[in-house]
Swiss-Prot record:
This is ATP-dependent Clp protease ATP-binding subunit ClpX. SUPFAM superfamilies: Glucocorticoid receptor-like (DNA-binding domain) (SSF57716), P-loop containing nucleoside triphosphate hydrolases (SSF52540). The keyword Zinc applies. Belongs to the ClpX chaperone family. GO terms for biological process: cell division; proteolysis involved in protein catabolic process. The gene is clpX. Coiled coil: none annotated.
């Protein structure tokens, strides 16, 4: 009996009415090239319609557990951030519930982990992330960067997938530097202060912003990418130096928690919106970041832990680099404490650790490969004389 000519099992057509047939492992089941192409288009449409936020929303405990792997200390801040981020994305998963957006304000000295917290959150949730410096922004019409360029960075990090960018996180640092010069509205234009707050206010509270795809200043003949910011989580950070005096005047205390002594660590400073308004933030701007999270100054012990404990700790990174050369690198506690002490003296917190350690390690990393040593012990004197660590390693190995 003659077998019928093969046809596409989806559209029923046979060549040459349709393209080539692809045979299935199942008997007499085929699909034509045209149907394959249509199926790909349908899948692409479904992909575009799918939610662009986190693929799975972790619980607050899971979020904090992940932060613990990268950020030392700051327990209260990590708990507050975990809950805030969880609620933000839960709100997006349930759009029928009328829950307002709650942006976050991080207050803490330089180098306490504000940027790291925001970055780690975005990476864990697998959402686009962008960092901006508030001091580079100006209101329209002045020399500087338009606030829409903040969203351009987010778009770039989302590979210009607008829907995905609209579920992202933006961290704006140095937000305290755009405070107006006094609590009363200025009679003159304040290019770096109130005007920038007003410009940022629009995108933070939720609007459709026109983003220039090439960056730079907007001009009339340029094409724009519309980005809806209502679901973008904005995390604002700043040191707010001098805010302690405003709080002190309000609560009538002599010490209140910005300077890092033992008592201050036990009694965290509580900043209220009125304090921020007195500092120079406009009321509308403060109202758009209702969650105020405070970070403690870091102690010497905190900095030693930062060097060794996080998943990507500096010490672990250097040890791995030396291990690739067949060398075991060990740091003494005295050396680590001295690195922490020097960073503390610089007043740059955790940011100073890498600069101090890198300066000491660069000569060692230059000379150690091919030296034949199997173990290097890096002690306190080696911070200023790093090659002595290599000499001592050779002597130990020879004896």
């Amino acid at each position: 009996m003659k077998r019928p000519r093969p046809h596409c099992s989806f559209c029923g057509l046979r060549p040459p009415e349709t393209g080539r047939l692809l045979e299935s492992p199942l008997e007499d089941v085929y699909i034509c090239e045209d149907c394959v192409e249509r199926a790909q288009e349908i899948l692409a449409q479904e992909e575009r319609r799918a939610p662009k936020g986190p693929s799975r929303l972790p619980r607050p405990q899971e979020i904090k557990a992940h932060l613990d792997q990268y950020v030392v200390g700051q327990e209260a801040a990590k708990r507050a951030l975990s809950v805030a981020v969880y609620n933000h994305y839960k709100r997006l998963l349930h759009p029928e519930a009328e829950i307002g957006k709650a942006n976050i304000l991080l207050i803490g000295p330089t180098g306490t982990g504000k940027t790291l917290l925001a970055e780690t959150l975005a990476r864990f949730l697998d959402v686009p992330f962008a960092i901006a410096d508030a001091t580079t922004l100006t209101e329209a019409g002045y020399v500087g960067e338009d606030v829409e360029n903040v969203l351009l960075r987010l778009l770039q990090n989302a590979d210009f997938d607008v829907e995905r960018a609209e579920m992202g996180i933006v961290y704006i640092d140095e937000i305290d530097k755009i405070a107006r010069k006094s609590e009363n509205p200025s009679l003159t234009r304040d290019v770096s202060g109130e005007g920038v707050q007003q410009a940022l206010l629009k995108i933070i509270e939720g609007t459709v912003a026109n983003v220039p795809p090439q960056g730079g200043r907007k001009h009339p003949h340029q094409e724009f990418i519309p980005v809806n910011t209502k679901n973008i989580l904005f995390i604002l950070g700043g040191a707010f130096e001098g805010l302690e005096n405003i709080v002190k005047a309000r609560v009538g205390k002599t010490t209140i928690g910005f300077t890092g002594g033992r008592r201050e660590r036990e009694e965290p400073l509580e900043v209220i919106p009125e304090d921020l308004i007195k500092f120079g933030m406009i009321p509308e701007f403060v109202g758009r970041a209702p969650l105020i999270v405070q970070l403690h100054p870091l102690t010497e012990d905190d900095l030693v832990r930062i060097l060794t404990e996080p998943k990507n700790a500096l010490v672990k990174q250097y040890q791995e680099l030396f291990r690739m050369e067949g060398i075991e690198l060990r740091f003494t506690q005295a050396a680590l404490k001295e690195v922490a002490r020097r960073a503390l003296k610089r007043g740059t917190g955790a940011r100073g650790l890498r600069a101090i350690l890198e300066k000491a390690m660069v000569d060692l990393m230059f000379e150690a490969p091919g030296s034949g040593v199997r173990e290097i012990v890096f002690d306190l004197p080696h911070l200023d004389h790093p090659l002595k660590a290599l000499e001592e390693a050779r002597l130990r190995q020879a004896s």
